A protein has these predicted regions:
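Cofactor-binding loops of NAD(P)H-dependent oxidoreductases
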Residues: 14-16, 118
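Surface-exposed beta-strand edges and their flanking turn/coil or helix-capping segments
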Residues: 57-58, 106, 115, 130-133, ...
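Catalytic donor-sugar/metal-binding loop of nucleotide-sugar-dependent glycosyltransferases
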Residues: 72, 93-96, 106-123
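Cell-envelope/extracellular polymer assembly enzymes that use nucleotide-activated donors
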Residues: 103
Length: 160
């Protein structure tokens, strides 16, 4: 993956749907460059300009994950994500789907990293449909898949 071959001191990503732009990664870096010098920091997006349905969905998932893992985590899939390249060593057993954002944040919390929210304006999707579904049926499938992964990850974390 691009993360593994990246050669910079910091690694960042955003989703390809351009609801947040690649420039948001750069802006997050500029706004938080001093904090990033402390290697135990993750910068993550905090989406603004969301519709009410998606906002409620995100809040519900944030509360659920915070309860299950006993650590406060909000707006899990917000983009961008930005961190020191040294953090990659903790991502050996990462999922290969949209659960990556959740995995990264849980590992960061377990390793006592500080998570800093960086506000981004969520833009309208220009092409295609959200993998999480732009409708109720898609959201329900995403919720079920995510809940299964959350419980699998929690069980795995108990073994560590």
């Amino acid at each position: 993956s691009g993360v593994k071959i990246a050669s910079g001191e910091y690694i960042g990503w955003c989703h390809a749907d351009l609801q947040t732009e690649p420039m948001d990664v750069y802006n997050a870096y500029l706004a938080n460059s001093e904090q990033l010098k402390n290697e135990k920091v993750i910068i993550k997006g905090l989406r603004t300009n969301r519709n009410m349905f998606d906002g409620i969905f995100t809040l519900g998932m944030s509360v659920f994950v915070s309860i299950v893992f006993q650590r406060i985590i909000n707006d899990i899939n917000a983009q961008p994500k930005l961190f020191s390249k040294n953090f990659i060593k903790f991502l050996n057993h990462h999922p290969h789907d949209f659960s990556l954002d959740l995995y990264l944040l849980i590992i960061a919390k377990l390793k006592n990293y500080k998570i800093i929210n960086h506000r981004v304006i969520l833009k309208k999707r220009l092409y295609g449909e959200a993998k999480g579904g732009g409708n109720i049926k898609g959201k329900l499938k995403l919720i079920i898949r995510t809940f299964i992964y959350i419980f699998q990850l929690r069980k795995k974390m108990w073994k560590l």
